């Protein structure tokens, strides 16, 4: 037997689809192209030493179905036969999966590529709109997801298909604009001298922002975790936490607006991940949308672009499942990202 890389787009069922984030891993199995997915409990990546161990014990040992194909979405760039995950110690080794777990075909995509596939595959009730035109345009879209890290992807519409454009947009520079920003930013933790989007617009970024506000105000922080900060900000019990959520929404709106301009995303900007859902009321309060639209000389364009918060936890699996069922609907390059067993 010889494992080779193949760019052909068609998948043999059953297909195991998996969304591997920095903290959680979600899996489901499609028995055929028409079947509803068989879902499995959400896994904590820290509970398993390797992804192979997680798949074996939590998936394969729990069902009589043996998947022939696997499509994984992972947090981080996909490059080579050993794929390191961002914010997680797992390493994806597709050839080893084929040899050890009985798969015939393994495809690995970027996690926000899967989120991009999802935005044209989800039902309307899986999203909450914040401003912009109510109708859904068949046009380019952007997905932005603050969570363990900050994921970014585009989704470009061609004549006949949707083309996901993955990237590492969470690591772009983010800087101060207002007088208050200039008071806070000197206290934000830097990575090699830079403040990146992920240093503010993520779970740990939320805490970085809170600590920066406390330092600017010359007070001792009393809240430890992003969950504590979010809760205190939402109920108004802590002024610094409340400002943290307001500024988080503002900075997220600025970045979302920048990306909408870069892609000219008339199809909308989509916010995914756990944080936007948890702080939905803060995102709807006004600061987010005001920052999103404040893009002179193109405010009129920005007013029309909708922002939608994805409220469905299994969105990435929905996107991967859509790709598995109807690959011709999408133009996804699997060159160098697909490994097949030839017998």
Curated annotation (Swiss-Prot):
Domain of life: Bacteria
GO cellular component: cytosol
Annotated binding of ATP, by residue: 18-23
InterPro entries: ATPase_NBD, Bacterial_glucokinase, Glucokinase
Kinase as UniProt keyword: yes
Keyword Acetylation carried by entry: no
Family under the similarity heading: Belongs to the bacterial glucokinase family.
Annotated protein name in UniProt: Glucokinase
């Amino acid at each position: 037997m010889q494992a080779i890389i193949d760019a052909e787009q068609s998948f043999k069922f059953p297909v195991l689809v998996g969304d591997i984030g920095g903290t959680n891993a979600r899996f489901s199995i499609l028995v055929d192209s028409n079947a509803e997915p068989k879902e499995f409990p959400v896994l904590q990546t820290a509970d398993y030493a390797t992804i192979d161990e997680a798949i074996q014990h939590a998936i394969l040992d729990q069902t009589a179905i043996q998947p022939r194909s696997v499509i994984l979405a992972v947090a981080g760039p996909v490059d080579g036969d050993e794929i390191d995950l961002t914010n997680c110690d797992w390493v994806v080794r597709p050839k080893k999966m084929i040899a050890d777990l009985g798969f015939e075909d393994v495809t690995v995509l970027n996690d926000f590529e899967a989120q991009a596939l999802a935005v044209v595959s989800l039902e309307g009730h899986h999203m909450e709109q914040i401003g912009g035109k109510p109708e859904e345009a068949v046009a380019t879209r952007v997905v932005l997801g603050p969570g363990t890290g900050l994921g970014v992807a585009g989704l470009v519409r061609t004549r006949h298909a949707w083309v996901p454009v993955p990237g590492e947009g969470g690591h772009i520079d983010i800087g101060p604009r207002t007088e208050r920003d200039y008071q806070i930013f000197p206290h934000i933790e830097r990575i090699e001298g830079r403040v990146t989007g992920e240093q503010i617009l993520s779970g740990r970024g939320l805490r970085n922002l809170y600590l920066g506000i406390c330092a600017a105000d010359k007070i001792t922080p009393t809240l430890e975790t992003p969950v504590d900060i979010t809760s205190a900000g939402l109920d108004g019990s802590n002024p610094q936490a409340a400002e943290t959520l307001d500024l988080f929404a503002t900075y997220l709106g600025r970045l979302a607006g920048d990306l909408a301009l870069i892609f000219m995303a008339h199809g909308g900007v989509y916010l995914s991940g756990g944080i936007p859902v948890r702080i939905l009321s803060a995102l709807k309060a006004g600061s987010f949308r005001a920052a999103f639209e404040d893009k002179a000389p193109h405010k009129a364009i920005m007013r029309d672009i909708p922002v939608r918060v994805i409220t469905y936890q299994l969105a990435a699996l929905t996107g991967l499942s859509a790709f598995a069922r109807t690959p011709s609907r999408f133009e996804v390059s699997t060159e160098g990202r697909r490994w097949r067993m030839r017998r």
